[in-house]
Amino acid sequence: MGAVVLSGCDKFLDHQPDDRTDLDNPVKIKELVASAYPQVFYAAFAESMSDNAGNKGTAERVDENFFPWKFEDQVKTEYDMPNTYWQACYKAIASANHALAAIEELGNTESTRASKGEALVARAYAHFMLVNFFSKPYNANTASTDLGIPYETKPEKIAVGEYKRGTVQDVYNQIEKDLTEGVALLDNSSYAVPSYHFTRNAAYAFATRFYLFKKNYEKVIEYADLVAKTAAIASTLRPWNTEYVNFSYYVLQNAYGNAATPANLLLVEANSKYGQSYAGYNYGLNSSLLAEVYGAGSNPLNLQLSFRSKVFGGTEVVYNIPKFKTTDIKESISDNFGEPYVVYTLFAMEEVLFNRAEAYANLGRDDEAITEINTYLSKRITGYNPNNAAHKLTSAKITSFYPAIPLKESIVETILNFKRQEFLFEGMRWLDIIRLGKTVTHRSVAGSKDNINITLGPEDPRRVLQLPVEALQFGLEANPR
């Protein structure tokens, strides 16, 4: 594939330093690296595409929810949309690249070592998320021919540069290079508020996700163990069945994205309306999905977990769990209105646990996988008692619940079941759907004003988001439709 020109670069590159000589000391570089995180969140479109989005049939349709639910390409660049996320990721990448270039010019000194590590891991993360939304999921048999996304490693000094899509394999190779090199350089003592930066644990958590996508299960376990061994991870999980279950709506909302919460390994403050809008989306948690996801009959234990009591709203029109607090930030004190910002969790301890459990299961280490899940359940079953047999997950219960599939697969399904409950509204479910090739069906409800019946199988090209119009206009190859 030949070189192409990617428009839209000016939309993020003009926010970067016009003259890199301004980055003439470690403090300035460190400040720039802090902006190397996408400040747009993906949950609005990821949740809408997933099987977490039922049709309520009553609420107003909004573009960031409706278009992804019916798997139609979006051309707008507004709050919480795929095109906006694309731009935010490349803006973050540009910050990382400018910082890395400045570090090189300063001679790669010890004082810039941690910033270099953070920039490399942040660059890897932004590309990882892009390739999984805008390309096919990693498949060792096809990755060398599947279209990737432009992997940018150099800062742009002009508004428009030349880019190549390359292949998914190319992108994954470069992600792994940046990730492994960057992790070795990180220094947790460098940050005033570590939860907003790639600390070692946050980077290790990212590595568990990366290698889970690659199906390198030994690596998943290796990096998960660096975060916390199974025996030690329980104390770092969200205290749903002891504290959260007693919290009021706004107390829970404040706690969920709090930097002091041990479960929050990496947070980002994103320009987003999702926190104030998701409960009212027409395509979201309706009554049938509430029972499917959180009902007692939804899992091998035949128990409701603590989440169920924290589903607020009273009616499916606004069912929600208060995970996102919106803050309006004004650019000037004279402004009447501010821009909405929400703190989102990019990596949590719970994901590390789930990734390790899934890796154990895929390696045939059934007992260790089930032990991992029981550790999780000790913080999710209300009134948990380790001596109560009803509170203990066993292979027999799993097999009974999934009688038609082998134990390994049934353990994985059990993990995905609890993972779906844990991360509802956060976009994680879509990543599992594309990674594992799960089918998604979206149907209109009787009496609704739309008439949609879509079943999206694992090979349906609409599972891959289309590139922004600006990118296509300047020659990047479109994803098939």
Residue ranges and their predicted role:
Residues 66-134, 166, 183-186, 337-344, ...:
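Conserved, well-structured interaction surfaces
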Residues 221-350, 380-401, 412-414, 422-428, ...:
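Hydrophobic-face positions in mid-chain alpha helices that act as interaction patches
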